[in-house]
From Swiss-Prot:
Reactions this protein catalyses: ATP-dependent cleavage of peptide bonds with broad specificity
Organism: Buchnera aphidicola subsp. Baizongia pistaciae (strain Bp)
Phylogenetic placement of the source organism: Bacteria, Pseudomonadati, Pseudomonadota, Gammaproteobacteria, Enterobacterales
Name of the protein in question: ATP-dependent protease subunit HslV
Record GO cellular component, one term: proteasome core complex
GO biological process annotation, one example: proteolysis involved in protein catabolic process
Function, as annotated: Protease subunit of a proteasome-like degradation complex believed to be a general protein degrading machinery.
Gene name of the record: hslV
Activity control mechanisms: Allosterically activated by HslU binding.
Family the UniProt entry places it in: Belongs to the peptidase T1B family. HslV subfamily.
PROSITE patterns in the record: PROTEASOME_BETA_2
Subunit structure: A double ring-shaped homohexamer of HslV is capped on each side by a ring-shaped HslU homohexamer. The assembly of the HslU/HslV complex is dependent on binding of ATP.
Catalytic residues (UniProt): T2
Top-rank EC class of the record's enzyme: hydrolase
Binding site for Na(+): S157, C160, T163
Database matches in InterPro entries: ATP-dep_Prtase_HsIV_su, Ntn_hydrolases_N, Proteasome_sua/b, Proteasome_suB-type
Length: 176
């Protein structure tokens, strides 16, 4: 699996993830890019789960963003509907964490589109560790969203055997 963490704080949203890909008990790649920008750099997305499945979902999600002119929530709901009802898509095993300047969502293969509490999203095998670390930093420091994501992922990589310390981190800043 992996760790994907998103923090929304002070007009900034950040999604970061590690780069480890495993096959059974073996690390097969250490620098997979599990976080990407989509829709002309207006949306960021990260995935946890099967790499091939996730890349398929990234492509489908970007098509939905184009179809619905970048409306994040509508695009996520339409992707979740297709994911849940299509015979082939239903077999894809991955989770997506997506965000634009205003909204953050988790999209699952069960058709769930979840808006997270506390402006935090954490998915994957190390998600709970990263979430706990991020909450502690939000409540007890004045770090930026990007600094929190970096430090929480670093902490997680020292605990979760399916998370490494090669990170991809993307951010969006809102003027509002």
């Amino acid at each position: 699996m992996t760790t994907i963490l998103s923090v929304r704080l002070n007009k900034q949203v950040v999604i970061g993830g590690d780069g480890q890909a495993t096959l059974g008990n073996t690390i097969i790649k250490s620098n997979v890019k599990k976080v990407r920008t989509l829709y002309n750099n207006k949306v960021i997305a990260g995935f946890a789960g099967g790499t091939a499945d996730a890349f398929t979902l990234f492509e489908l999600f970007e098509k939905k963003l184009l179809m619905y002119q970048g409306q994040l929530q509508r695009s996520a709901i339409e992707l979740a509907k297709d994911w849940r009802t299509d015979k082939i898509l239903r077999k894809l095993e991955a989770l997506l964490a997506v965000a634009d300047k205003e909204t953050s969502l988790i999209v699952t293969g069960n058709g769930d589109v979840i808006q997270p509490e506390n402006n935090l999203m954490a998915i994957g095998s190390g998600g709970s560790y990263a979430q706990a670390a991020a909450i502690a930093m939000i409540e007890n420091t004045s770090l930026t969203a990007k600094q929190i994501v970096e430090k929480a992922l670093k902490i997680t990589s020292g605990i979760c055997i399916y998370t490494n310390n090669i990170f991809t981190i993307k951010e969006l800043t809102s003027e509002k």
